[in-house]
UniProtKB/Swiss-Prot annotation:
Gene3D superfamilies from the UniProt entry: TusA-like domain
Family that this chain belongs to: Belongs to the sulfur carrier protein TusA family.
Keyword set includes Metal-binding: no
CDD domains, alphabetized: SirA (cd03423)
Name by which UniProt lists this protein: Sulfur carrier protein TusA
NCBIfam families: PRK00299.1 (NF001423)
PANTHER family, per database record: SULFUR CARRIER PROTEIN TUSA, SULFUR CARRIER PROTEIN YEDF-RELATED
Compartments (UniProt record): Cytoplasm
Length: 81
């Protein structure tokens, strides 16, 4: 079984940050990425379980994978056009 979270193009450590900081940091990081690149987000704010998927839907990026059963939460986002 392959680890979908292995070898992302970029990593964002949002541990210890609380809403709305994680999503603000994701937005800033994604702006500087090229289409098709991936971003691994590591967070421990329970609000990210709602905010990160919502951000991906709203901005039309792909949420490739998420792990929210245990801390820290992990999300893998792929930037679209």
């Amino acid at each position: 079984m392959t680890d979908l979270f292995a070898n992302p193009d970029h990593t964002l450590d949002a541990l210890g940050l609380r809403c709305p900081e994680p999503v603000m940091m994701v937005r800033k990081t994604v702006r500087n990425m090229q289409p098709g690149e991936t971003l691994l987000i590591v967070a421990d704010d329970p609000a990210t379980t709602r905010d990160i998927p919502g951000f991906c839907r709203f901005m039309e990026h792909e949420l490739v994978a998420s792990q929210t059963e245990t801390l820290p939460y992990r999300y893998l986002l792929r930037k679209n056009q």
